[in-house]
């Protein structure tokens, strides 16, 4: 058995650098022009000389990128032995990728990228172990493979899937809707849906979604801000119901940098709007979707992060409020007094990455000692035990539903290629659902050990 270590990568890098057998002087890197921009944050002036490089559509930026690429190639192409290393790394990096499924109705939706495909493909299974069926293949949408599948959201029953595509890495998606059974593309399209958040109504008739403004609707330069929440009703003739007529639900008059997301309760009554304000603060708003009342803020306005889910009239909130490693609080939907919130799962030594109600249980993901942990709780906060993982490694996605007795999680490690496992809530058994094949790697030939060392300040 061989021990696997990051030292392998250091030795590989050293071998590449040592292989440079050219004595010629490398070309000079391109010089980026300095164009000072000064921002004032909390009374402190911050100088940014390279703000202009953030505009990827600027001819000046594109010219600099071309020069930088030429410089990079001038360095890398001189390295002897590079072709052999490139070949082996290509083998290792071309095993593809896979995502945890999203469950809707009796369907299982997930993405997979095979080998050197430019874009992942959206597949659907109509039963647990049924055949995979291609639903959206972004690779077929352009000759050069540069149209990306950015995101997707199945409707509650899985009848439809809303998905976003964008060209050439722009990420400014256009929303499309496909019928799962037939593959028919509906006429509804919505532009400017970058990184969209979508919440379908339970009857598949429409959805709440986020959208950015058109040019001219906001001051110049603000088009990548002012993300608002709208509602769209499906229609057979979008000319009779253009996106511009979709009613605005949330965002008017708020900070242009707000980043709202949406979700609906399992009974379809409550719309939860989660508003990211930078990297350290989140606000939660709740709207009675049946009564169509204005959204009500339920958080305190303090500098904490919150993420929530409404199930059977209760709001389950994951937060770092007075808990830097996060905890779960619970409150009654409709009663937003902060004093009525109760702690359901206290913070622990591990850092909680998230929690969700699946199969009538709380499924919580933690990270400790650079490795993932999965734990189950009942809805009163009682610990029910851990979900055993295949090895020391990382859970990079999960999926489930409030009305299904199964949970899926995506797992990978140094020796495990990306794999999707299914946990049966009734039996407590875990099984492999699907995985990425890595034929050039033999996991049995390696061992993975986690070693600890003491730093200068005494920290282990």
Feature annotation, model-predicted:
Residues 5-15:
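Bacterial N-terminal signal peptides
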Residues 9-10, 37, 163:
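N-terminal hydrophobic alpha-helix used for membrane targeting or insertion
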Residues 16-19, 24:
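Boundary at the C-terminal end of the N-terminal hydrophobic targeting segment
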Residues 25-42:
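Short acidic, Pro/Gly- and aromatic-enriched capping/linker segments at domain boundaries
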Residues 44-52, 56-107, 111-134, 138-460:
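Peripheral, non-catalytic segments that deliver or gate enzyme domains
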């Amino acid at each position: 058995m061989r021990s696997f270590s990051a030292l392998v990568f250091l030795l590989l890098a050293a071998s590449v650098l040592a292989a440079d057998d050219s004595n010629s002087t490398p070309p000079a890197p391109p010089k980026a022009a300095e164009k000072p921009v000064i921002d004032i944050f909390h009374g402190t002036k911050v100088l940014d000389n390279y703000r202009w490089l953030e505009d990827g559509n600027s001819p000046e930026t594109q010219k600099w990128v071309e020069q930088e690429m030429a410089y990079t190639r001038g360095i890398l192409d001189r390295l002897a032995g590079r072709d052999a290393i490139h070949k082996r790394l290509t083998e290792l990096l071309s095993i593809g990728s896979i995502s945890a499924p999203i469950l809707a109705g009796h369907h299982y939706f997930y993405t997979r990228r095979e080998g050197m495909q430019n874009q992942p493909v959206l597949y659907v299974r109509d039963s647990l172990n049924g055949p995979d069926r291609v639903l959206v293949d972004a690779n077929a949408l352009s000759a050069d493979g540069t149209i990306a599948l950015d995101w997707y959201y199945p409707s509650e029953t899985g009848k439809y899937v809303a998905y976003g595509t964008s060209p050439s890495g722009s990420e400014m998606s256009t929303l499309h809707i496909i019928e799962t059974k037939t593959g028919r593309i509906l006429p509804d399209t919505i532009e400017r849906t970058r990184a969209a958040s979508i919440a379908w109504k339970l009857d598949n008739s429409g959805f709440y979604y986020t959208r950015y403004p058109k040019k001219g609707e906001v001051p110049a330069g603000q088009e990548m801000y002012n993300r608002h929440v709208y509602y769209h009703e499906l229609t057979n003739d979008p000319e009779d119901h253009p996106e511009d007529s979709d009613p605005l639900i949330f965002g008017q008059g708020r900070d242009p940098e707000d980043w709202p997301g949406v979700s609906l309760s399992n009974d379809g009554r409550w719309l939860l709007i989660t508003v990211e304000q930078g990297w350290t603060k989140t606000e939660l708003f709740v709207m009675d979707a049946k009564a169509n009342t204005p959204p009500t803020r339920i958080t305190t306005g303090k500098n904490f992060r919150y993420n929530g889910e409404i199930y059977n009239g209760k709001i389950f909130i994951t937060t770092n409020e007075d808990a830097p490693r996060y905890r779960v609080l619970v409150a009654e939907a409709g009663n937003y007094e902060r004093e009525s919130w109760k702690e359901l799962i206290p913070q622990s030594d591990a850092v909680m990455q998230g929690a969700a109600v699946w199969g009538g249980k709380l499924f919580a993901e933690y990270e400790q000692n650079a490795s993932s942990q999965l734990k189950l709780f009942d809805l009163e906060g009682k610990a029910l035990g851990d979900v055993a993982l295949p090895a020391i490694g990382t859970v990079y996605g999960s999926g489930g539903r409030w009305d299904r007795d199964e949970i899926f999680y995506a797992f990978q490690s140094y020796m495990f290629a990306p794999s999707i496992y299914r946990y049966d809530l009734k039996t407590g058994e875990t099984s492999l659902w699907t995985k990425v094949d890595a034929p050039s790697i033999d996991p049995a030939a390696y061992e993975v050990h986690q070693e600890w060392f003491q730093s200068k300040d005494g920290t282990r």
